[in-house]
């Protein structure tokens, strides 16, 4: 079978999604091989409707039949994986719609945008008119739990840096790795207290981005990740945060951190 072009794949994906039955059949058969009775019981639809959908999928080489049992072909399996990911991405964005819609996402690489479904169990916290510091307070309380932290620091914020230094000083925070911009790094370097207690701290590793731009604030420990973003007008927003404590969410966050780490140079202590 010849390889399909991206345009052909898009058209076929759209064709699948325009039918609830076709979509349900692909997802159902992703679990295991099934016969008509299995599919009737699961989908609660008449045999004629199910058979029509199966025939359409067979014609597209997504489903095959053997001894009255239906299963996905290799192409069907790939389609199912992409379909499930697409649905989970949509769900992940929908449940935290206010967070994603109101911010600049250009700092998130395409690969992680495509895997945003891994944040589907994130907790969204937003400050309110009666509690303007709710998001920031939640963040400060969160990092107090951490023995190790990875932080992508896009802004020079004394509130955040002072809290980090406090945790380093009382030794509750044992390891800290920071990725930041050249501008933020120089601001830290020109601050005597921060230079002494942060830049020259043996428990701290700092990486400076070669491109002087960072559009997200990400913090990761072994137990949680926390994401804040910028508004579309370029201003940093500390009033909305996304906290994730799942293995999937941590994987997503660490992949994002590693992406930016590859674009950085390590600061060598004097």
What is each PLM-predicted segment?
Residues 139-196:
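Primarily the HKD phosphodiesterase
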Residues 9, 132-136, 160-161, 253:
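Amphipathic coiled-coil/heptad-repeat helices and related helical stalk/stem segments
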Residues 182-223:
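HKD-type phospholipase D/PLD-like phosphodiesterase module
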Residues 32, 154-158, 212:
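Short beta->alpha connector loops
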Residues 1-91:
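Basic, Lys/Arg-rich alpha-helical nucleic-acid-recognition elements, primarily the DNA-binding modules
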Residues 254-270:
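Cysteine/selenocysteine-centered motifs that mediate thiol-based redox chemistry or coordinate metal-sulfur cofactors
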Residues 85-138, 148-150:
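Amphipathic alpha-helical dimerization/coiled-coil segments
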Residues 207-249, 257:
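HKD (HxKxxxxD) catalytic microenvironment of the phospholipase D
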């Amino acid at each position: 079978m010849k390889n399909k072009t991206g345009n052909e794949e898009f058209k076929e994906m759209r064709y699948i999604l325009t039918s609830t039955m076709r979509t349900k059949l692909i997802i159902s058969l992703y679990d295991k091989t099934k016969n008509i009775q299995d599919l009737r019981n699961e989908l609660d639809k008449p045999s004629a409707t199910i058979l029509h959908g199966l025939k359409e999928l067979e014609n597209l080489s997504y489903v095959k039949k053997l001894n009255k049992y239906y299963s996905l072909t290799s192409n069907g399996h790939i389609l199912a994986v992409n379909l499930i990911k697409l649905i989970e991405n949509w769900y992940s964005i929908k449940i935290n719609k206010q967070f994603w819609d109101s911010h600049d996402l250009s700092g998130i690489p395409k690969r992680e945008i495509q895997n945003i479904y891994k944040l589907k169990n994130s907790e969204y916290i937003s400050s309110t008119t009666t509690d303007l510091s709710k998001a920031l307070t939640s963040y400060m309380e969160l990092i107090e739990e951490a023995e190790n932290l990875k932080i992508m620091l896009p802004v020079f914020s004394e509130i955040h840096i002072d809290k980090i230094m406090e945790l380093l000083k009382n030794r509750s925070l044992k390891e800290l790795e920071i990725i930041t911009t050249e501008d933020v790094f120089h601001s830290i370097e020109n601050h005597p207290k921060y230079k002494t207690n942060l830049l020259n701290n043996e428990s701290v590793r700092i990486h400076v981005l070669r491109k002087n731009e960072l559009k997200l604030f990400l913090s990761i420990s072994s137990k949680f990740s926390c994401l804040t973003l910028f508004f579309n007008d370029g201003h940093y927003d500390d009033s909305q945060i996304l906290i994730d404590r799942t293995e999937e969410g941590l994987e997503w966050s660490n992949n994002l951190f590693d992406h930016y780490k590859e674009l950085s140079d390590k600061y060598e202590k004097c």
